[in-house]
Amino acid sequence: SNYLTCGDCMNPPWKFNVRRGTTLGGLVAVGAEYEYADYGSSKLEDMDGYELGDQPSVESFLKGVHTFRVGMEARLAPQFSVRAGYNYTSAAFTEDAYSALPLYRTSTDFNNIKDKNTLTFGLGYRGNVVYADLAYKYDVYQSDFYAFDDIDLPATKVDNSRNQLVFTLGARF
């Protein structure tokens, strides 16, 4: 088997998930969810199941990721709802992670993303045929950016924030 033909050779980690939600008075829905994914236990294998050479990097630099989500939606009127949510995801890489670039890769940079926080707010309309949704999403996280593959190169500290406004319009047939 040609190991270079392996499209996605990373076997994903095991995950643990628990969630709970309820409705209050038929007008408000609330929910919370926790998920743990052990990315450090992922396996890099070729098509025949043999471990690839980068496996020690997976075990050394990837770690367990905690994700916590909480949200609510309230019906303001029979056709209108408002919602809000929060999402926290811990970093997947260890602090000392760096990119040991393979020979077949042409990019030189590596961005070690830290814990990520996301806030969302939305307003929705649901008619008999037409529905519409307007949502705002704000992501904020820090990262260590490495311009080149050099373990002694100090990271550039980057503060990242992203604002998104998303509008969806649809019709039911």
What residues fall within each predicted segment?
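Outer-membrane beta-barrel porins/channels
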Residues: 1-173
